[in-house]
Amino acid sequence: MHRAGLSLVLQRLPTKLGAYHVLGSNIIIINRRILDIIKTRRSLEEYNSYLFMVLCHEYLHSFGVVDELQVRKMTYDLCQSLLGESHTASLMARYEPWAVFPDLNLYQTNKFEEAFEIVKNFDRTTQSYIS
């Protein structure tokens, strides 16, 4: 079985949208606005926890699981089993990031910015081990 590598895009999105997977594609788009807020206001561990949880969630969508509630439960189960129930990633998966990072609610916007950045070398699973 072969899966095409995933592409990761950073784009400033409305603050109520953390990330999304483009259905039928290999693209995950993460909200750069939220990443910037967490990075400047929280610890590196909290930032990494957010990234882990969001990437896990969108990765599950990339397998074709479209039911949002099912993916949320799967994300929580995965975070809890790997990191423990009280880990920040598990708490965000269970209650949503806005419950864990209430300061995100201070930055309300519905604006989609056109500019985006493609993260290079995000998923190298399609590359050969022998060059």
Write out the residue ranges for each language-model feature.
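Metalloprotease/metallohydrolase-associated module, dominated by Zn2+-dependent proteases
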Residues: 1-18, 22-37, 66-131
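Short acidic, glycine/tyrosine-flanked loop/strand segments centered on an H-E-D-like triad
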Residues: 29-56
